[in-house]
């Protein structure tokens, strides 16, 4: 065995142990030898993906596929690379390639569902995910993917709740633990998330971690994702204990949580990527709560509480939740703006001579209802244009597909500008300088994008529905004193867009002062919010309703 063959074996062993940075170093040494065979390119590409080097990883996987075009392993990993690069049309094509040769491949159907939804084609995505679940009813990932996508188009509370109950009925029943006595000691809160990094969820956690009463609460973080960045360092510094649980078996993590004596275990992911709901099913803590990262009930019998507010979940919403709803007396989340955000730009309408509407929401939220609303707004405002930014629009075909959807509704595609992924947070925020008025998505409202728009001086018009996901815009806008921008029908949505567009001086004035308004609003009152959250935690530990 030559040295490079031995080093390849070492790299493979490190990869099997999930020691990806070390594995990548070893594969890189093998690459320097000039090795070029299918197995090497597949494994090297996979290691690059795990180390966040997605473009290089994709290139290695493409080299592997040139040597073995129908390799399902390489194609599946290529799908992951395409997702990370925002190339959702290419991800769809790779999934269809797999299914051409293996039509019963449930993972390919599941990924196809996500790829379609990521292009705003959620109904087609739901069909593909149905197929994945039918082929493999025990695959938890496909069920989670299905529920994620369903939120993009759901308007019926009973139907959404039933879907969650049905797909979560396979979790085993585990007896509840007795409520702990916390008198004379700090309450131990455990947060479980795959997003302790630069991620949308992190911007709503930062204020909490900055303001927790550390004399009264001991903070534990259980990270379900090994990716790290400057935000990860922040969470490590602002918690008492930080544990990476990536790749560790649920039973072992549950034992660790029990040993840590956690009083309340808080899930921050729901059915989203990197969730550990299966860990919660073992009931490692006496009280378990869902918060922030998911816009609906989990449907899980082992989740005791869900944190909301009275606007997102008014009276009657309890009927659609398996958890007990705890309504905070403040907005259900608190925004911590990006610390180095650029200043808001001048109003673009003043130099353009027309109003530009915009959306920076994930393309999964671009439902038919959303496009209908936006087209009403464009119809009502002569000369107006629409700027739509989402990762998938780095692909020209995805842009063409979106413009066709506008054209089918009578809107000239020339009025629509698409933008793909923008690297760097400052550049991303600077792109709001192209937008005069943001239009929200429906029935799944924006959250981070709404907060970003407001911080950059851009007002947001939202449509209010019946479910939590369709009421987040109302909560956010009300928190900054702009509840009047929340409408309840398409006619009012369009009328409000037209009225705003006719008074650019009012828009300019609002743009100049909006950041100050937001900074001093309930949306950014981190201390007040954290005190309310801590009181909610104390409530959860009291016996009775």
Task: List PLM regions with ranges.
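Alpha-helical solenoid repeat scaffolds of the TPR/TPR-like class and their adjacent stem/linker regions
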Residues: 1-354, 362, 368, 372, ...
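A conserved nucleotide-sugar
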Residues: 216-218, 375-404, 408
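Thr-Gly-centered strand-to-loop micro-motif
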Residues: 267, 360, 389, 440-441, ...
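Nucleotide-sugar-dependent
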Residues: 272, 440-449, 463-471
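Active/binding-pocket-proximal capping segment
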Residues: 392, 409, 455-456, 467-470
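Short alpha-helix at the nucleotide-sugar/activated-sugar donor binding site of glycosyltransferases
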Residues: 454-455, 478
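Short acidic/histidine- and often glycine-rich active-site loop of Leloir-type glycosyltransferases
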Residues: 470-481, 486
């Amino acid at each position: 065995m030559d040295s490079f063959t031995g080093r390849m074996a070492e790299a493979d062993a490190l990869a099997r142990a999930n020691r990806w940075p070390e594995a990548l170093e070893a594969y890189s040494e093998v690459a320097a030898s000039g090795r070029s065979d299918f197995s090497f390119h597949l494994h090297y590409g996979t290691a690059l993906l795990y180390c966040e080097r997605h473009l290089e990883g994709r290139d290695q996987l493409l080299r592997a596929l040139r040597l073995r075009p129908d390799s399902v392993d390489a194609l599946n990993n290529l799908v992951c690379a395409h997702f990370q690069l925002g190339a959702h049309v290419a991800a769809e094509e790779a999934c269809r390639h797999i299914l051409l040769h293996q039509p019963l491949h449930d993972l390919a159907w599941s990924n196809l569902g996500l790829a379609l939804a990521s292009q705003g084609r959620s109904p087609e995505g739901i069909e593909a995910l149905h197929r994945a679940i039918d082929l493999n009813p025990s695959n938890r990932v496909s069920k989670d993917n299905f529920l994620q996508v369903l939120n993009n188009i759901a308007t019926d509370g009973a139907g959404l709740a039933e879907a969650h109950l049905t797909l979560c009925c396979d979790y085993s029943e585990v007896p509840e633990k007795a409520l702990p006595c916390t008198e004379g000691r700090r309450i131990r809160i455990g947060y479980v998330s795959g997003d302790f990094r630069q991620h949308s969820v992190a911007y709503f956690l930062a204020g909490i971690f900055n303001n927790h009463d550390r004399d009264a609460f001991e903070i534990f973080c259980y990270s379900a994702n090994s990716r790290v960045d400057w935000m990860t360092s922040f969470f490590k510094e602002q918690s008492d204990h930080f544990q990476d649980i990536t790749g560790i078996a649920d039973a072992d993590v549950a034992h660790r949580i029990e040993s840590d004596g956690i009083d309340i275990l808080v899930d921050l992911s729901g059915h989203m990527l990197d969730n550990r709901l299966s860990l919660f099913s073992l009931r490692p803590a006496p009280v378990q709560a869902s918060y922030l990262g998911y816009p609906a009930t989990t449907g899980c019998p082992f989740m005791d509480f869900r944190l909301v507010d009275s606007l997102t979940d008014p009276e009657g919403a309890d009927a659609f939740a398996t958890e007990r709803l705890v309504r905070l007396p403040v907005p259900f989340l608190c925004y911590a703006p990006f610390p180095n955000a650029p200043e808001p730009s001048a109003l673009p309408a003043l130099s353009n001579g027309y109003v530009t509407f915009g959306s920076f929401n994930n393309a999964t939220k671009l439902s038919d209802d959303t496009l209908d609303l936006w087209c009403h707004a464009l119809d009502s405002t002569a000369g107006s244009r629409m700027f739509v930014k989402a990762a998938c629009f780095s692909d020209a075909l995805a842009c063409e597909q979106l413009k066709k959807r506008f054209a089918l509704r009578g809107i000239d595609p020339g009025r629509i500008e698409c933008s793909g992924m923008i690297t760097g947070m400052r550049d991303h925020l600077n792109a709001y300088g192209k937008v005069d008025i943001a239009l929200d998505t429906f029935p799944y409202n924006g959250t981070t994008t709404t907060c970003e728009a407001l911080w950059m001086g851009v007002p947001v018009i939202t449509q209010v529905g019946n479910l939590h996901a369709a009421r987040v815009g109302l909560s956010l806008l009300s928190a900054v004193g702009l509840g009047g921008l929340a409408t309840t029908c398409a006619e009012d949505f369009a009328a409000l867009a037209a009225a705003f567009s006719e008074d650019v001086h009012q828009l300019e004035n609002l743009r100049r002062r909006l950041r100050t308004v937001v900074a001093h609003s309930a949306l950014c009152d981190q201390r007040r919010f954290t005190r309310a959250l801590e009181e909610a935690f104390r409530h959860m530990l009291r016996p009775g309703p």
